[in-house]
Amino acid sequence: MTPFPGPAEPSTEPTNTSRHDDTFHPYSTSSTSHFDSSLSTPRTSSISRSGSISRSDDDPLLGILPTAADADRPWLVWYSPDERIELTGHVLSMWAAKTAGLLSAEAGGRPRVHVALEPGWRALTWCLGTWLTGGRVLMGPAAPLGAAGADEPDASVADRQEALAPRAGVQVLVPRASLATGWDGALPPLVLDGVADVMPHPDAFAPVRTGAERTALTLLAGGGAVDSSRGELAAEAAASASAAAGARAVLVRVPDAARAVRAVLAAWTGGATAVLLDAAAPDSLARTAARQEGAVALAPRPTAAGTGSPN
């Protein structure tokens, strides 16, 4: 367990920083950079699990997720070349609740939700919202759905129209910009706005408890589909968390959203803040993020049966 390697300082650093604190101001920004080279100690502290949804052997995944009580620490810090965004567990729980509210209203109970988004905090909140409804996330391109024998999704969420599952009953487009307040431009007919249409929903959602054996995640790739149950995701997160035991923050730098979500769950299971990097982030930004947040990188683990990809 070592900090992300690299002694070199980046030549340029992000110029925009945002912090989502315990008061819900979803897009409060500041022009003051948090990247102060004079800081000698990281700001991120370990997460207290006291406010989390109580763990249950029947549905262990819910016990990992943040709640409205988790307001005193950042649970997620997002880094891209242009910005740094902090989200407390409280704010993440509100985004998840609003997302769950939209899914329940538009797609019904325990929906199958296709998520075709790049790694980022928005992709994470769509997964969290789906799991609050007791639903199942399908991640990957829409094309393998039929060939893989996977059920058609009730909803499809993407950042471009061509990535939407064409036969999904509900289609949602999410802007790529982290701080966007809505889709940029005209939406196709009957397609929902993944920010503007989410915001009116309530800040709280009573989680639907379901069995540990119920499928939580389906990975779509190469004409196949690999399922992971809610219990398997929770067990995998616990096993991965042991590789960074005692860390206050975990660096998550992976090329796809599915692995990013799994790594974030592992960080949270270990009581750490997840420091999530844009997939296109250069090495210099990764070094900056690791230094500023006191983050360590999780060692890769072999692919486990039924999980479909390494952590």
What residue spans do the PLM features occupy?
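Conserved AMP-binding/adenylate-forming
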Residues: L102-G140, A243-A272, L276
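Conserved ATP-dependent adenylate/AMP-binding module captured primarily in the ANL superfamily
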Residues: L138-V191, A238-A249, A280-P310
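Surface-exposed beta-loop interaction hotspot
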Residues: R167-E232
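Active-site and donor-binding regions of nucleotide-sugar-utilizing enzymes
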Residues: K98-T99, G129, D159
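Intrinsically disordered, low-complexity terminal tails and inter-domain linkers enriched
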Residues: F4-D57, A143-Q161, P166, A305-P310
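Conserved AMP-binding/adenylate-forming core of the ANL superfamily
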Residues: W75-A107, T210-A245, R287, P300
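Long terminal accessory regions outside catalytic cores
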Residues: M1-E9, S56-D58, V77-I85, V91-W95, ...
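A short N-terminal helical cap/helix-turn-helix that marks the beginning
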Residues: P5, R55-W75, A206-A212
